[in-house]
């Protein structure tokens, strides 16, 4: 895929192993973990923008919530949003790399299926607003087999919430009502 991307105009690439053929006038950066490096680069890029950023997570309703928030914000602000439901370690950086100087707000959807993933995406996103739609059974088998495990994983969204940030929780969700905010 590297040579295809480079031949279509990419200036360079991050790679865990050097390709057999190096194309002229392209750059190659060797990294141990390409996914980690992509996320670190996206986080660095996001920090160049002093705009409100909403990070949305939850067991269900993430995409609908993201679309509604972006539609409302878009009435008054030039708002970037996650495309479709590209809410993983590849899609989140791709969204952040679409930030431009004219953007005034962003709504970033983040999904997960293991502990640590929402915190990692929050490290990239650096949210000023954190939204948890609900806590359900999605991926429960990877999260201690309990909804409390799912709650703990979703609560990772607060790890990188701005100190003066806002948490928005679904008041109808019984587990979200057990959280004591500010969350530490």
Question: Could you tell me what each predicted segment is?
Answer:
Residues 1-40:
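N-terminal leader/targeting and accessory segments in enzymes
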Residues 36-171, 175-183:
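Phosphate-binding loop of NTP-binding sites
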């Amino acid at each position: 895929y590297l040579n295809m991307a480079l031949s279509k105009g990419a200036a360079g690439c991050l790679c865990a192993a050097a390709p057999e053929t190096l194309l002229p006038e392209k750059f190659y950066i060797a990294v141990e973990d390409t996914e980690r490096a992509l996320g670190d680069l996206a986080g660095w890029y996001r920090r160049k923008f002093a705009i409100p950023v909403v990070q949305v997570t939850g067991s269900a309703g993430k995409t609908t919530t993201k679309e509604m928030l972006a539609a409302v914000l878009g009435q008054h602000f030039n708002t970037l949003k996650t495309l479709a439901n590209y809410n993983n370690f590849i899609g989140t950086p791709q969204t952040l790399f679409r930030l431009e100087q004219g953007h005034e707000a962003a709504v970033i959807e983040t999904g997960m299926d293991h502990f640590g993933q929402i915190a990692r995406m929050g490290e990239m996103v650096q949210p000023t607003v954190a939204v948890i739609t609900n806590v359900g059974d999605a991926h429960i088998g990877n999260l201690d087999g309990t909804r409390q495990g799912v709650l703990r994983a979703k609560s990772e969204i607060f790890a990188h919430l701005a100190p003066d940030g806002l948490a928005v929780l679904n008041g109808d969700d019984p587990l979200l009502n057990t959280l004591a905010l500010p969350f530490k």
